[in-house]
């Protein structure tokens, strides 16, 4: 009987730990910080946690413009990877066809980390647009897709990721406030 109680206790404890781990993994964690003349808000991907969705704000732009970028990690290592630098590649954002500009490709761990840009925009208008966009779809999903003379699978082993943006507005507002302290200190 004693072993049975210990066995049941272990099973219940295991389920509790697993449910707690799943709850923690599902949390939307934002990093808000500053570096030199810029501040940023960043959230990790749900499919690939190391893929980040970034919102950069620079003091150089009087903290009024936001640069929206994302990173993708891939194990693929084609010999012509660097030819994608400064090129636009096709993506789908919640199913909508757009492009992203490849800003950087750097060796990372056993593959490459690719940094892509979605552009720069006035902060307030863009962040509220994104919030409405996210609220409408209840997701923010980017899929790298095939295009003219471009096969996504050649360069990316995982072509889709999504991010939670429930805390987008307060996170970017905090990053914007940080940017203004940089601007104030530099003037």
Q: Model-flagged regions — what are they?
A:
Residues 1-26:
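Classical Sec-dependent N-terminal signal peptides that target proteins to the secretory pathway
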Residues 23-187:
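A generic "folded-domain core" signal
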């Amino acid at each position: 009987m004693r072993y049975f109680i210990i066995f049941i206790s272990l099973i219940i404890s295991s389920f509790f730990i697993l449910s707690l781990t799943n709850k923690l993994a599902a949390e939307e964690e934002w990093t808000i910080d500053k570096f030199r003349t810029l501040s940023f808000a960043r959230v990790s991907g749900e499919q690939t946690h190391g893929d980040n969705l970034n919102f950069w704000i620079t003091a150089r732009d009087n903290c009024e413009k936001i640069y929206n970028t994302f990173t993708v990690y891939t194990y693929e290592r084609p010999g012509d990877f660097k030819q994608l630098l400064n090129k636009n590649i096709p993506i789908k954002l919640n199913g909508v066809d757009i492009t992203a500009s490849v800003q950087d490709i750097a060796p990372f761990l056993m593959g490459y980390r690719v940094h892509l840009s979605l552009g720069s925009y006035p902060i307030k208008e863009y962040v509220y647009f994104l919030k409405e966009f996210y609220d409408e779809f209840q997701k923010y999903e980017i899929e790298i897709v095939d295009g003219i003379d471009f096969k996504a699978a050649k360069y990316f082993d995982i072509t889709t990721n999504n991010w939670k943006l429930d805390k987008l507005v307060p996170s970017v507002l905090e990053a914007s406030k940080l940017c203004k302290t940089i601007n104030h200190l530099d003037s």
